[in-house]
Curated annotation (Swiss-Prot):
Residues binding Ca(2+) 2: 350, 352, 354, 361
Protein known as: Sodium/calcium exchanger NCL2
Superkingdom, natural source: Eukaryota
Glycosylation, residue list: 179, 298
Signal peptide: none
Organism of provenance: Oryza sativa subsp. japonica (Rice)
Induction remark: Induced by drought stress.
Swiss-Prot/TrEMBL GO biological process terms: calcium ion transmembrane transport; intracellular calcium ion homeostasis; sodium ion transport
Membrane topology recorded in Swiss-Prot or TrEMBL: Multi-pass membrane protein
Amino acid sequence: MAPPPPPTRCLPVLLLLLLVVAPLLAHGRRPFISDGGNANANANASVLRLPSAAAAAGEDMGCEMSYGFLPCTTTAWGNLFLVLAYGFLMFKSATYLSSGSEMLLQILGPGIVGGLFLPILGALPDALLILVSGLSGTKEVAQSQVLIGMGLLAGSTVMLLTLLWGSCVVVGKCDLSENSTAIDSRDTKGFSLLGSGVSTDKQTSYAARIMAISILPFIIVQIPKIFKLHSGHQITVLIGLIVAALLLLSYCLYQVFQPWIQRRRLEYTRLKHVMSGLLRHAQKHSIGRLLDDEGRPNVSVIEKLFHRIDQDNDGKLERGELQAFIVGINFEDIDWNSNLAADQVMADFDTSRNHFIEKGEFVNGMLRWLDEAKRTVTSGAYSKKFLNDFHARTRDEQTGLLDKDEEEGEADGNPTWTCIKAILLLLLGTAMAAASADPLVDAVHNFSNATHIPSFFISFIVMPLATNSSEAVSAIIFASRKKKRTLSLTFSEVYGGVTMNNTLCLAVFLALVYVRGLTWDFSSEVLIILLVCIIMGLFTSFRTDFPLWTCFVAFLLYPLSLIMVYILDYKFGWS
């Protein structure tokens, strides 16, 4: 077995990631020049415009072309198309950053890289969008566009703690026992508000407490507004910036020296790889195919596989029989012993907790795994290659250790090659995020002007979908496994994402406000962030069991947040 590459092979290249962003942002935008004479230009700007000789000569076209060549328009439909196009690019960049981060974490393990670099890279798309929202143009233009950054910051936090949190409760609900604890994989009470729900572990509540503490910088910058002070706004912005940066550093160092958060992510991806390996082996050695051409599970083949594993023919699988089957798989591409793998499968399949896997439990467990494999790998043909692709994807997220399987290829199991692939994904994701952030902000701003919808509401609703939808889909898929452990890992990721929003993204926003001398006038926006974080933070910090009715509390907070901003800004004149 080849040892994993030392961190020094990957660390220098990771340092370059921070240097890649600066040149892209420094040369990405042209100064915004407006003389107020856009009436004629606007009348002629009904289509997407490409650069022309007139543009090269500096003629005003009514809209600003990012990088001097990307199309622009002043119409609502044209800008909607641009928002969707650039939003998709931002979505792909977030996907690449997430995949590269997971792969690198598996190779290097918990430590400096996993604690310092990877959390920052995960929040990079949001941070870049916030940065470019007020980076260029006059002070007045920056003051107008920076509201897009605040909308993204508030929308991302609120979406994670309301829509995503509530969705995970709905799809992950199980029957609650007499002591209100969820029973893994048992969901017979339907949508009973009190009889079904989810449970998490204590460490998940610790992550929620860290998230609640991270709102401190928001409170600091609001002090002049709270006490109606006429001076000291810039000082409090600077203090808030310093506190946010210190909290970010503390959070990262905490993960380095107490790496339980990283280990939870590591455990999460390893479980996915064991699942994919068992499915692939079952496909190869079962009598028939596990899926037909339409992707429907073949229950008879799954039952034949059960009888093959059941060596004593007593109609149930003992742990020893399961371990013997796993030993036959010969996991050469994963640093895992058969005892641990058998424990993982027993915990996932044995829903009755009688230390046996009955035929019904085995069939249901295989059906869940196959369903998750279908949702993870988008393949047109459900052949053997389908499960091979699923296994390859989870292996890339796993250890990168040497793989001797002939079908997978020699290079895929090489840890050095996996490290290079992870870094390339990170570089590609960073470059895409840096390149598409500026055009996306411009498109949102122009769409707001064309439709007369405040840019805050557009960025609050639309932009978090571009930067967080990949993680949201993954979280919902794994919450649907209806296990306390996977739900705990899922909620920990949600709370970690909010913590990075409240530290890194807020620090970027405050730095932008302070350096450019912008006015801090975001009381209503900060208020909804504080309310949602405090309500959900207190709610999740001191309890581990959540009945189904709690999801409606989370869901209601989302529209209430939008309504509150509208009333405070447009009825009471807060902004």
